A protein has these predicted regions:
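Short, small-residue-biased leader/transition segments that mark boundaries at the very start
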Residues: 1-2
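Hydrophobic core
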Residues: 6-10
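Extended soluble regions of mature proteins
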Residues: 17-281
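Sec/Tat signal peptide C-region and signal peptidase I cleavage site
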Residues: 11-15
């Protein structure tokens, strides 16, 4: 969890056509137990890579009608991961890419890249059934109010080693232990301020009567560290337009198929090919 930081605000007054920028930092924690038996130097390299993937900064451009959320650009040594399979994205499952929300039509457009191909995920914003708790706290110069929602999430697993042997089709193990997805209950906590009259927030969070300044969602925490109103350079908020348009469910199916394809390729390299004398590891 973050150490508490002071929020700094630049205020130029509100009007119906006000706009602003909110700066957020996000941190996700993952279980590192799978690295216990790994050589120390290799574990150190992986942890460094994971740190870059799990700790990110974002900017939310907003006005009363729409918002645009994207990761803050950071130059990395070596040019980053480049195009291809982003295994960290499949491991942590973040809402990557850029995200535009039209708060009037209730439509979002999420621009994502997968294996070098650009997709525009366009779908309706699902209303969130927030529960107001009545709790308040001070965040910067603003009174923030607490809202929560409880949901069931499916456990995600990612293995870098050998997979557990699959039960044979029709065997007693398969019949008595069907491979059903494991789920657990997660509470999401949002702190929002009605003093900033924007029904939006970081990533897909929103639907509250004010800008969301802080989110605690299972293993991910998002904290707003700065808000600037009516910046000198006027903000142009537009939905991304280049890419293949798909629905959320269509994109999830594409990503799932690609993940399975990469997993099969990885297993094939580990086990080698029967008709090839050279074993690829």
């Amino acid at each position: 969890m973050y150490k508490r930081q002071v929020l700094f605000f630049s205020l130029n007054g509100f009007s119906q056509d006000f706009q602003g920028k909110a700066y957020y930092m996000s941190k996700t924690t993952v279980n590192m137990d799978w690295m216990k038996n790994m050589p120390p130097d290799r574990a150190k390299r992986i942890k460094s890579t994971m740190k870059n993937a799990l700790e990110k900064n974002y900017i939310l451009d907003f006005n009363s009608n729409s918002s645009y959320f994207e990761e803050e650009e950071v130059l990395e040594a070596g040019g980053g991961q480049g195009r291809g399979f982003n295994w960290m994205q499949f491991m942590t499952g973040p809402e990557g890419g850029t995200l535009h929300k039209d708060l009037q039509s209730n439509i979002y457009t999420n621009k994502k890249e997968l294996f070098g191909k650009v997709f525009l995920i366009k779908d309706s914003i699902t209303p969130t059934k927030w529960v107001m708790t009545g709790e308040t706290k001070q965040i910067g110069i603003y009174n923030a109010y607490k809202a929560t929602i409880t949901k069931e999430v499916e456990e995600q697993a990612f293995s870098f080693g050998r997979r557990r042997a699959e039960p044979a089709a029709g065997s007693d193990e398969e019949n008595t232990n069907p491979r059903l997805p494991k789920t657990r209950t997660v509470e999401t906590i949002a702190w929002f301020t009605p003093d900033i009259p924007v029904s939006s927030g970081p990533s897909m969070y929103g639907g509250l009567p004010g800008l969301i300044l802080e989110i605690s969602d299972d293993k991910t925490s998002i904290l707003c560290i700065k808000v600037v109103f009516n910046p000198k350079d006027k903000i142009k908020i537009k939905a991304p337009s280049k890419g293949k348009v798909v629905t959320k469910s269509e994109f999830e199916k594409i990503a799932e198929d690609k993940a399975k394809e990469m997993q099969e390729m990885y297993q094939g390299r580990r086990g080698g090919r029967r008709n090839n004398a050279r074993v690829i590891r």
